[in-house]
Amino acid sequence: MDDTTARERLESMLAELDRSIGVLRGDPVAVRDRSAADAGSDLTDADRTQAMLTVATAQRRAVVDALKRVDDGSYGRCVDCAKPVPDGRLEARPEASRCVQCQSKRERRR
């Protein structure tokens, strides 16, 4: 993927993530007199919202990092081995910072 296309896709992703994060950070559920079941449901919803916010924030960080790589000329190169990241991977995940092999190694270590 060329740098211009990558930048456009990444900037679009960043704008969408910023919108999503804004929605997820919206007003907390107002505390009212509720049944125990309703209160439990609110906690579950809050936990789910927090999990989605955590994922969106991490993805936003990856997109910002990818934009920095576009700026410094290293976009499309694996941050671990410096080999090219396959175009198919970048098409699917423009924010990808590692080739498939290095990403697999990283995930196995977790």
Named regions from a protein language model:
Residues 80-81, 101:
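Short, cysteine/histidine-rich loop/knuckle motifs that typically chelate Zn2+
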Residues 76-79, 97:
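Cys/His-enriched microdomains
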Residues 72-76, 83:
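Conserved RNAP core-binding helix
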